[in-house]
Amino acid sequence: MKYYIIAGEASGDLHGANLIKGIRANDPEAQVRAWGGDKMQENGADLVKHYKETAVMGYASVIKSLGKIRKNLKLCKQDIADYNPDVVIFIDYPGFNLRIAKYAKKNGYRTFYYIAPKIWAWKTYRIKAIKKYIDRLYSILPFEVDFYKSYNYPIEYVGNPLLDAIDAQLNRGELLDDFLKRHNLPHKPIIGLLPGSRRQEIKGLLPMMLRLKPHFPEYQFLISAAPGISEDYYEQFMDDDKNNNLIHNDTYQMVKHADACIVASGTAALETALIGTPQVAVYKVGGGILAHAVGRLVIKVKWATLVNLIMQKEIIKELLQKDFTFTKLKKELKAILPNGEKRANILNQY
């Protein structure tokens, strides 16, 4: 069969790569064409566009990028027509994917959605498009099943592939000393920084994270470098230790060996919890006051992180938008480090 898969960010690339492995296990002759990233390409996808060329976030950024978005939509539709796949598979990224789903469905292609759109959080009206244009919907979050069923739409829970991905990378049981030696790092405890996978996220989060360094001198701060983001981009926010701070392609080991992490709210927060490292989740979108005001109107859930949503209570502290301040971040980080008053509670509830 011929498969056309569309993912628009780093987490989608990870899920897409695992999906391709599963497809090939059941269909060894599968042909896969995709929008995604390095991981999908490494697993045999013929890549049309890398997500680093298509990712847009924040209301202001979307407005500025309307021309690019229209161009990519046109390219994607034409590429599907030229490739003529047996099925089009969408991975999250609903702003783009639901527009393509409309085109695909109207032109007779089967449409599957893997990693269901998080319409329980915002833009619930998208259920209309999902019902109209998506043939089969798959979820990796158990609580989504009841949500979609409440709208009389069938959804299949398929488990969370992050567990397999984490186990595969951590099963070698590497010790802290080995990790430090492999990365030429000093023998100091670690605070891990995961500022996101997009430039806008990194720009909004990393400078504040790095301001903490002088206040925790006994620690080394390590930054998880996102695929597709150049070292030059990170270095503009870093000090003279820049050559030692970036960790490439080894996020899970970094998180495992860290005493605590500061994490951009998203897939990384769930991964950090599954690994078992205490964390503070942070986020700040672009667009200033307007973006925050609009966000408050459209977001319908009490928490932003999947960790808290799955448990339906606050397990990890979320510092979002106006709450993402230096004073609060310093306080919450101190509270989850060894001997901190919140550390034991987080570890007990993971």
Label each residue range with its predicted role.
Residues 1-350:
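Nucleotide-activated sugar donor-binding and catalytic core shared by glycosyltransferases
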